[in-house]
Amino acid sequence: MAQPKRRWSKQRTHKHRANWKIEAPNLVECPQCHEMKLPHRVCPSCGYYKNRKVVNED
């Protein structure tokens, strides 16, 4: 496997990593209970997904 000819300096490494950003998760409102949830997932508070009860509350 190919190897780099020269070592990256700390400054170059930090400049390269400056573009690594943490993005906030995209949240949508649940149509049943109006709580915020992740899209395309079962609502953790009411258990509905696509207007159907998927998870039973015990």
From Swiss-Prot:
Keyword check for Flavoprotein: no
Taxonomy, superkingdom: Bacteria
GO cellular component, one term: large ribosomal subunit
InterPro entries in the cross-refs: Ribosomal_bL32, Ribosomal_bL32_bact, Ribosomal_zn-bd
GO terms (BP aspect): translation
Family, similarity comment: Belongs to the bacterial ribosomal protein bL32 family.
Record protein name field: Large ribosomal subunit protein bL32
The organism of origin for this protein: Caldicellulosiruptor saccharolyticus (strain ATCC 43494 / DSM 8903 / Tp8T 6331)
Lineage, broadest ranks: Bacteria, Bacillati, Bacillota, Bacillota incertae sedis, Caldicellulosiruptorales
Gene name linked to the record: rpmF
